Structure formats: structure tokens, C-alpha cells
Design a protein with these regions (language model features):
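Conserved AMP-binding/adenylate-forming core of the ANL superfamily
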Residues: 16, 36-88, 105-110, 171, ...
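ANL superfamily adenylate-forming
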Residues: 2, 127-174, 283, 337
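A short helix-loop-beta submotif of the ANL/AMP-binding
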Residues: 59-60, 71-72, 78-98, 102-106, ...
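Conserved pre-ATP/AMP-binding loop-to-beta segment of ANL
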Residues: 17-18, 32-35, 164-182, 189, ...
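Gly/Ser/Thr-rich phosphate-binding loop
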Residues: 243, 263-271, 280-337
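ATP-dependent adenylate-forming carboxylate-activation enzymes
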Residues: 77-78, 98-114, 125-135, 243-264
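Conserved AMP-binding A3 loop
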Residues: 45-49, 178-202
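Conserved AMP-binding/adenylation subdomain of ANL enzymes
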Residues: 201-218, 228-268, 278, 282
Length: 337
């Protein structure tokens, strides 16, 4: 009876016993000069060798702040190159990165600051959506926090941290917590889900395997990096394969997403159903050259069959029979091994 209910398909690849930092070293040694990240809206690019060096600089900078193995470090930002640097740098330092939703208001931020016990928070002063500095001041008022450092990316503190002397931890274990993500809180208070290095590395391995990613691929990631879709599916599949991460904009923009596919000759694109609908609704949709695409992912919300088939035909054209646009289901709480 059990055999009829439980089964697996596909190759039985062994789980990787690597930390995020160890995987970064492996990928950088294989493809040092290949593109790792392209942040289109910032006009910034990094190779895998450059990203590895940047991660080490972040880790040493965290050490100089007094951040040690197992400490929590918050990141409150929309999509940017600095987000990827912090993701890799915290992992290298053995610190747990706490993803903070950029849409948080002061009471939500205060809850996260308190519950996570983060010792440092990295953020921008403000953007078109919000003044984060003001929200932070309101959030911390009257609270007893462990927060000792606030580092603004758009201040001299950030480059100074990257140049700070420090050291890397002697050992980071695969079962150490790499990432804490807070749930949406629709049925109660948000819960901090703790994801280990072992979890996210192997999630990335099987995603890269399923998409047949190689160092030749470029993955457009318009979904938010603070979410599991962005920081696990978006970054770790690239880290496992040597593919490049392409960030089209700070937040989702349909035109910027298609422009990134067009300009970078991307081979894969991610999104939730509503993002694809917005892209197809652009008046100039037909002006974008999407012929480089061979695969992609739709996740994050229910998807009617009609929308999925439309995505296949419009993004992949006549190639849809040979290509794969994957529907992916999952929740943060069970996104772990």
C-alpha cells in the first residue's frame, strides 16, 4: 500500500554536504570569470570571483562589528547587488541572515527586530516606496533590542565595512542556520522559519538539475529577494550551476523584466502568475526579443491552466513543446531537508 502512495522519479543524486560559502568557493573555482550577478537598474555586474571576494569582505566587516558565529543580521532592502553580497557574506561569516520585508510598517518591523534578536541591520535610507530610516526610528521606540548596528548602503559606512580588517570563522557547519524568513502571518503572528545551509544548498542543487542549468544560463529574477522564491530558488539554483542572476529592477516592473531578458539574452525567467499577466499586457510586448528563453518558473500563487498555457506560448513561442516552464509549489515552513 505504501509503495503506491509514495514514490520518486528522476535521478537519485546524493545530497551535497556543503555550506553556502563552500558552494560559492566551488563555483568560483570552476567559473571565476563567468558573470555571477547583473543588476540592470544599478548598472552593476560581478563575476563569480568578484562575488566571492565581496562575500569575504562582508564577512570580515561583520567580524569588525562584533558579529560572531550564530548571530542574526537583518537585511531590509529591495532587490539589488548589495542584497546578494549580504546573502553570501553572512553565510561566509556563519551568521544567520534575517530577511526583512521592504513593505513592513513600524509595528511589523518592531516585531521582527524583537523576535529575531538581530544584532545588526543593513538597509537604505529611503526609496520611492518608503523612508526606511524614519520607519526604523518609530519601530525601535520604547523597545529593548539587541540591535547594536545599523548600516546604510547609501552612506560611507558601507564601503568602510567592506574595507574593514577582520577574520573569517574557522568553521561553519552545514546544519547551521543560514537564513531566517518570516511567514506572512495570515493566521497569526509571523513565524521565523530557520533554513540551514544544507537546506538551501540542496534545494538549489535539485532546482538546477531540474532546469538543466549550466554556466551558460542567465536567470532573470524579478521576484523579491527577501522571499524564499528570490533568495533560495532565485540565487541558489544559480550558485549550484554557475548560471548568472539577472536583477531587472528594485521591485517588479513588467517592462524592466522583459527588457532584461531582451538585453541580456536570458535563458530563464521567474515570476508569479500576476507578473506574467502584467508582462503580456504591455502594449509593446511584441517588441521584445524573447527567443533566447528556453525555460522558466511560475510559482507563488494559484495559476489557472489558461494562464499557464498562455505563458508557454507567448514566452517560448514555437519552442514551447521542447522547452519547460515549470509550476512550483511549496511553503517556507517545509522548504527544508
Amino acid at each position: 500500500m505504501l509503495s503506491t502512495l509514495s514514490h520518486t522519479r528522476g535521478p537519485n543524486r546524493p545530497l551535497l554536504e556543503l555550506t553556502i560559502g563552500g558552494l560559492l568557493d566551488r563555483t568560483a573555482s570552476l567559473y571565476p570569470d563567468r558573470l555571477a550577478v547583473a543588476s540592470c537598474h544599478q548598472s552593476k555586474r560581478m563575476t563569480w570571483a568578484e562575488l566571492t571576494a565581496a562575500a569575504d569582505s562582508v564577512a570580515r566587516g561583520l567580524w569588525s562589528l562584533g558579529i560572531r558565529h550564530g548571530d542574526r543580521v537583518g537585511l531590509w532592502s529591495t532587490n539589488c547587488l548589495e542584497w546578494i553580497m549580504m546573502h553570501m557574506g553572512c553565510a561566509r561569516a556563519g551568521a544567520a541572515l534575517v530577511n526583512v520585508n521592504p513593505a513592513y510598517r513600524s509595528h511589523e518591523l518592531g516585531y521582527t527586530l524583537t523576535r529575531s534578536r538581530m544584532k545588526a541591520l543593513f538597509l537604505w535610507h529611503k526609496d520611492k516606496r518608503a523612508n526606511y530610516e524614519e520607519i526604523l526610528e518609530r519601530a525601535r521606540h520604547g523597545l529593548s533590542l539587541e540591535l547594536k548596528h545599523t548600516i546604510y548602503f547609501d552612506s560611507p559606512e558601507w564601503p568602510a565595512l567592506l574595507d574593514a580588517p577582520g577574520q573569517l570563522p574557522a568553521h561553519v557547519a552545514v546544519d547551521d542556520v543560514a537564513n531566517i524568513q518570516y511567514t506572512s502571518g495570515t493566521t497569526g503572528h509571523p513565524k521565523g522559519v530557520m533554513l540551514t545551509h544544507h537546506n538551501v544548498v540542496n534545494n538549489g542543487q535539485f532546482l538546477a538539475q531540474g532546469f538543466h542549468y549550466t554556466e551558460q544560463d542567465l536567470i532573470v529574477v524579478p521576484v523579491p529577494l527577501f522571499h524564499c522564491y528570490g533568495c533560495v530558488i532565485g540565487t541558489m539554483s544559480a550558485l549550484n550551476s554557475g548560471a548568472a542572476i539577472v536583477l531587472p529592477n528594485w521591485t517588479f516592473d513588467a517592462h524592466a523584466t522583459l527588457q532584461a531578458v531582451h538585453d541580456e539574452r536570458a535563458t530563464s525567467v521567474y515570476g508569479v502568475p500576476a507578473m506574467y499577466v502584467a508582462e503580456f499586457g504591455l502594449p509593446d510586448f511584441a517588441s521584445f526579443d524573447l527567443t533566447s528563453l528556453r525555460t522558466g518558473m511560475m510559482s507563488g500563487a494559484p495559476c489557472p491552466v489558461e494562464d499557464w498555457l498562455r505563458t508557454h506560448s507567448l514566452l517560448l513561442g514555437e519552442r514551447w513543446k521542447e522547452a519547460a516552464h515549470i509550476l512550483y509549489f511549496g511553503v517556507r515552513e517545509v522548504a527544508r531537508f
